[in-house]
Amino acid sequence: QSLVQTCPHCDTAWEPGPSGGMSIVPFFFPSGEEPTIYLPFWNLHCTASGFHLQTWADLVRLTNIPRVVLPWMESTSFSFRVPAFKIRPELFLALSSRLSLYQPTAEEREKLPGAHLHPVTLPREEAFQALPVVLGYLAPARKNLFPKILGGSLRPVQTRIEYLPFLEKPEEFIQPEMNMAIQKK
């Protein structure tokens, strides 16, 4: 059962709330090809205490990923993107890393797409709990990262659900814009 329910007739999306269903706005990544399936991802904006992680520049400096800090990175906020569905831990971390570093722009749509929307099976709270591990996975030299974040914490500020388009093939799901494939098994 999906944690986000969609209605193709009225083009709305809902998730459970304390007093019933709450209307939400799903976002969709554009695609050059007609997708056969959309996989859901949580876009998680957070604030850090004990270390700096608000912008792209903060991420590059904190994790020491091999990128040059460019002027736009100083003012562009960084958010984590993690799968909103349960998968093997290795694949979860690989997808989280790939999508968090790629940072494609998702858009609101007036109508829900006709392609299948994969169910959201990972609650946002569980996705948020994974962020310290995802942050560690992003760092090429984890032993240098851990002293920087020791005693620090991440707090959620804003979350939203975003759907990434894929082409379904017999053995895998392909995301052409990111040149990425996910094995079905």
List where the protein language model places each region.
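Long C-terminal interaction/binding lobes of large macromolecular proteins
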Residues: 2-185
